[in-house]
Regions:
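N-terminal accessory beta-strand-rich subdomains and adjacent acidic, glycine-rich linkers
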Residues: 42-298, 302, 639
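Aromatic- and carboxylate-enriched substrate-binding clefts and catalytic-loop regions
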Residues: 354-535
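C-terminal beta-strand-rich structural cap/linker in extracellular carbohydrate-active enzymes
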Residues: 645-667
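Bacterial Sec-dependent N-terminal signal peptides
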Residues: 1-42
Length: 667
């Protein structure tokens, strides 16, 4: 409960304020003191439109919070605080004070779902004190649909550092909640002991508190359907100063807690508990809430509460790239076939090509320099793949031992800069420990000094990194396109997974999927291997559906002649950066329709994972009555068609999306 003043609180508990004989004033004075103490240990904050509300209180000395939206419970009383090596901040806490404030800012940001963000939030800082009189601030910021909160600690006398041994931070969902979660992997499993790498399958609409596959809990972001509302839980602002976290398995009552990395990650090396210098702060934990999925898909909270850590050394340019490895695999990493993919990039008008793992042995550094020169002659720039590992997994691909320490890394980056290379794709991280977060940051900061962009693969999710690091241009952290080559199961599930990512993984940041596969069969000659189940227009739609500023598309030279001309023409023009994103319709795992704007051109794309054609009426206010737009669709035989569609009523644009098919409307 939240009360505006002491009188309101007193009346709630005791019915009325009455005049009393002197004898009874002592009793009422005692009751008033108890009520005053209760009032002093509660606080609340709402979003600017008052629909989202967070209540804070101390329950028997333990800090807890709860969340409602439109008066309906999203989170029941959930614990806060932590235990550290210098004191317990999760119990025996006392209320010291509270302070309210407002946060207003407008910022521009490339590489995310929109280019200009207006952030307005109400801020509440609650100051507590533990049994040893050590203070702790819990800072909450609420915008209309987003909550961000973190812990801020001062220096305690001469104690200028601390280790957080365990967080009490939790998220207690009502028992009727269903979940859309991906399990956290066991450490040191999978191919060459490279997990966890955020590449596990989601289970949709699962009952809350279902045990996770590995017993390690669930990765961020985590989506919850809470009655009439939806909630997305994640974190942002993680860098070298903390570990990355995930959710524990839930209690039977639906309480998920913040969990630190398994000690076995990184081959058992490095601490799984984070250390901080004081004064210091934890990362922001975020909760996005709405009565529908629109606030989830459109959220910018990962970027709203963080700031750039350094200036870009140059103006980084984003765009499209070819990539031989995805369709032609390891044998394609040779000089002659890289020439073919440079030529493909040139023919498509793409900005980049990616030379993948194995180049050091199969091509060699001298001939790599020749490739770089050839690419530049064709007006194509180059990304080069690197293995991140030093001593934490067995991944064999080269180039190895170039990114894991500063001396080797700077030497390598100096060579790449000299050769005119524009970026790196660094693979096989396999841990969320603070030491690994430091490696991510070191790679990014060193790369900026040499004018290099960075894509991470086999990695953790980004946590506000697009805003924090100006040369960061993508993370995999998803069951990406390579799995379509490896196993037919993932082709069978492709449409379903595509209808999850816009609601979960891609909501919180870049997702380097490496998609848009126009081969019917996933091998070099388009006549063997796994079979694509989705339509050509579905594949084209994912070029817009999946958001990442550098898109390594899975096209091959043969597609210039064996793919439909309309598909190649579309892929020559599709952009990779967006000024605006609008969610239109959908349900996780079933279908998704959204719109993105690049400059003054809109792209409305939809995909359908269901077994029947999907008829929709879309509200498309970006176009006026009488306008004509290009309409890509599948016919009943699943063949791609390009038509001109005249907008009769922008509020009711009728479309049909075929099973495992797609649509695109653009102008």
């Amino acid at each position: 409960l939240y009360f505006n003043n002491f009188k309101e609180l007193f009346i709630h508990f005791y019915g009325t304020v009455v005049k009393t004989p002197m004898k009874k004033q002592v009793l009422f004075g005692t009751l008033a003191l108890l009520a005053s103490q209760a009032f002093a240990q509660q606080a609340a904050v709402t979003g600017p439109d008052s629909r989202l509300k967070l209540d804070f209180q101390l329950q028997d000395g333990k800090p807890v919070y709860s969340v409602t939206y439109d008066g309906k419970t999203v989170l029941e009383n959930s614990p806060l605080g932590f235990v550290s090596n210098i004191g317990d901040f999760s119990r025996q806490m006392s209320f010291v004070g509270q302070q309210a404030d407002k946060v207003e800012k407008t910022y521009t940001q490339d590489r995310i779902k929109c280019s200009t963000v207006n952030y307005s939030a109400n801020k509440l800082t609650v100051t507590l004190e533990n049994a040893e009189k050590k203070k702790l601030d819990i800072v909450f910021q609420l915008s209309n649909n987003d909550i961000a909160f973190r812990y801020e600690m001062p220096q305690y006398g001469e104690t200028a550092c601390m280790v957080i041994e365990k967080e009490a931070t939790g998220f207690d969902f009502p028992s009727t909640t269903t979940t859309f979660l991906s399990p956290q992997s066991d450490p040191m499993i999978g191919w060459k002991r490279t997990k966890p790498s955020y590449e596990e399958e989601y289970v949709p609409d699962e009952p809350v508190a279902t045990p996770s596959k590995y017993g390690e809990g669930y990765t961020f972001p985590a989506l919850f359907h809470v009655g009439d509302n939806w909630a997305l839980v994640s974190e942002t602002g993680v860098r070298s100063l903390y570990c990355a976290s995930h959710l524990s398995d839930a209690t039977k009552d639906g309480l998920y807690s913040i969990a630190f990395p398994n000690p076995g990650e990184m081959n058992g090396l490095g601490s799984s508990t984070p250390g901080l210098a004081l004064p210091g702060a934890t990362p922001w934990r975020t909760i996005t809430v709405g009565s529908g999925l629109k606030p989830i898909v459109e959220t910018t909270v990962p970027f709203d509460v963080v700031e750039p850590l350094y200036e870009p050394s140059q103006e980084y340019k984003f765009g499209r790239s070819t990539w031989s490895w995805i369709m032609w695999q390891d044998p394609s990493i040779n000089y002659d076939e890289q020439i073919r993919f440079i030529d493909l990039a040139s023919e498509m008008g793409y900005e980049y090509t990616l030379i993948d793992g194995g180049w050091e042995k199969n091509i060699g550094r001298d001939r790599m320099e020749e490739l770089f020169k050839y690419a530049h002659q064709k007006n194509v720039d180059v990304f080069v793949w690197y293995n991140s590992n030093g001593y934490w997994n067995d991944a064999p691909q080269d180039a190895k031992q170039c990114m894991s320490n500063s001396v080797a890394r700077k030497k390598e980056m100096k060579w790449l800069q000299k050769c005119g290379v524009k970026g790196l794709k660094v693979d096989f991280f396999g841990s969320d420990k603070q030491q690994m977060m430091g490696l991510y940051e070191d790679i990014l900061t060193d790369a900026n000094e040499y004018g290099l962009m960075i894509i991470f693969h086999g990695c953790t999710i980004p946590r506000g990194w697009e805003r924090m690091y100006p040369n960061y241009v993508g993370s995999e952290a998803v069951l990406a396109s390579e799995n379509l080559i490896f196993n037919q199961h993932f082709d069978d599930m492709e449409a379903y997974n595509a209808c999850l990512h816009p609601f979960i993984r891609n909501t919180i940041g870049c997702m380097e999927f490496g998609g848009t596969l126009l081969n019917k069969r996933h091998n070099r000659t388009n006549d063997g291997g796994t079979v694509r189940k989705t339509t050509d227009v579905f594949q084209l739609a994912t070029a817009v559906l999946y958001q990442n500023p550098i898109q390594n598309f899975a096209l091959a030279p043969n597609n210039l002649t064996d793919a439909p001309a309309l598909a190649i023409d579309f892929m020559k023009e599709v952009p990779t950066t967006w000024d605006e994103t609008v969610f239109l319709d959908g349900y996780p795992g079933k279908y998704c329709v959204l719109a993105r704007r690049h400059g003054d051109r809109w792209y409305v794309v939809g995909v359908n994972a269901q077994k029947e054609p999907l008829k929709l009426s879309l509200n498309l206010p970006m176009w006026k009555k009488g306008e004509t737009v290009s309409y890509y669709l599948d016919d009943k035989k699943r063949q791609p068609q390009l038509e001109e569609l005249k907008i009769k009523n922008p509020a009711e644009v009728k479309v049909v999306i075929q099973p495992e098919g797609g649509i695109i409307l653009t102008k």
